[in-house]
């Protein structure tokens, strides 16, 4: 995605939380928010260097190279930060069109209908077929 010099100024300009994390929103080329995750310094640096989204898995306590198991990589076109420098917005191309482990286009598929959450988006591929 980009060449980095030895300066860490661009990383230090961000507001990391107490655990060294920053929220990251992934938005596809149509403007749809497809995912929310966290990044640490290592995952953000790797994302910039390799051009594919790399997050920090808080549950697995390791780098999560999006698509490493499913093949549904996220090619990063640009990275922006908000006015406070405490949230990242990744403009991505979602390879395979599936961002969610449930087999949907977006992780934001549940919609509030009255007092219930209902799935508003279809499953594009059975997760059993994605994660063999």
Swiss-Prot record:
<dbReference type="Pfam" id="PF01502">
    <property type="entry name" value="PRA-CH"/>
</dbReference>
<keyword id="KW-0862">Zinc</keyword>
<dbReference type="InterPro" id="IPR038019">
    <property type="entry name" value="PRib_AMP_CycHydrolase_sf"/>
</dbReference>
<dbReference type="GO" id="GO:0004635">
    <property type="term" value="F:phosphoribosyl-AMP cyclohydrolase activity"/>
</dbReference>
<dbReference type="InterPro" id="IPR002496">
    <property type="entry name" value="PRib_AMP_CycHydrolase_dom"/>
</dbReference>
<dbReference type="GO" id="GO:0008270">
    <property type="term" value="F:zinc ion binding"/>
</dbReference>
<comment type="function">
    <text>Catalyzes the hydrolysis of the adenine ring of phosphoribosyl-AMP.</text>
</comment>
<comment type="pathway">
    <text>Amino-acid biosynthesis; L-histidine biosynthesis; L-histidine from 5-phospho-alpha-D-ribose 1-diphosphate: step 3/9.</text>
</comment>
<dbReference type="GO" id="GO:0000105">
    <property type="term" value="P:L-histidine biosynthetic process"/>
</dbReference>
<comment type="similarity">
    <text>Belongs to the PRA-CH family.</text>
</comment>
<keyword id="KW-0378">Hydrolase</keyword>
<dbReference type="InterPro" id="IPR026660">
    <property type="entry name" value="PRA-CH"/>
</dbReference>
<keyword id="KW-0963">Cytoplasm</keyword>
<protein>
    <recommendedName>
        <fullName>Phosphoribosyl-AMP cyclohydrolase</fullName>
        <ecNumber>3.5.4.19</ecNumber>
    </recommendedName>
</protein>
<dbReference type="GO" id="GO:0000287">
    <property type="term" value="F:magnesium ion binding"/>
</dbReference>
<keyword id="KW-0460">Magnesium</keyword>
<feature type="binding site">
    <location>
        <position position="107"/>
    </location>
    <ligand>
        <name>Zn(2+)</name>
    </ligand>
</feature>
<dbReference type="GO" id="GO:0005737">
    <property type="term" value="C:cytoplasm"/>
</dbReference>
<comment type="subunit">
    <text>Homodimer.</text>
</comment>
<keyword id="KW-0479">Metal-binding</keyword>
<keyword id="KW-0028">Amino-acid biosynthesis</keyword>
<feature type="binding site">
    <location>
        <position position="84"/>
    </location>
    <ligand>
        <name>Mg(2+)</name>
    </ligand>
</feature>
<feature type="binding site">
    <location>
        <position position="100"/>
    </location>
    <ligand>
        <name>Zn(2+)</name>
    </ligand>
</feature>
<feature type="binding site">
    <location>
        <position position="82"/>
    </location>
    <ligand>
        <name>Mg(2+)</name>
    </ligand>
</feature>
<keyword id="KW-0368">Histidine biosynthesis</keyword>
<feature type="binding site">
    <location>
        <position position="86"/>
    </location>
    <ligand>
        <name>Mg(2+)</name>
    </ligand>
</feature>
<feature type="binding site">
    <location>
        <position position="83"/>
    </location>
    <ligand>
        <name>Zn(2+)</name>
    </ligand>
</feature>
């Amino acid at each position: 995605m980009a060449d980095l010099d030895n300066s860490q100024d661009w990383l230090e300009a961000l507001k990391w939380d107490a655990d060294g994390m920053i929220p990251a929103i992934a938005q596809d080329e149509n403007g749809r928010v497809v995912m929310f995750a966290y990044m640490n310094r290592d995952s953000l640096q790797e994302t910039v260097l390799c051009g594919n989204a790399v997050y920090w898995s808080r549950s697995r306590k390791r780098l999560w190279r999006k698509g490493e198991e499913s093949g549904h990589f996220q090619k990063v076109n640009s990275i922006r930060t908000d006015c406070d420098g405490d949230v990242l917005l990744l403009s991505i191309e979602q390879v395979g069109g599936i961002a969610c482990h449930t087999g949907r286009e977006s992780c934001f598929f549940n919609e509030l209908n009255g007092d219930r959450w209902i799935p508003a988006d279809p499953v594009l591929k059975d997760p059993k077929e994605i994660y063999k």
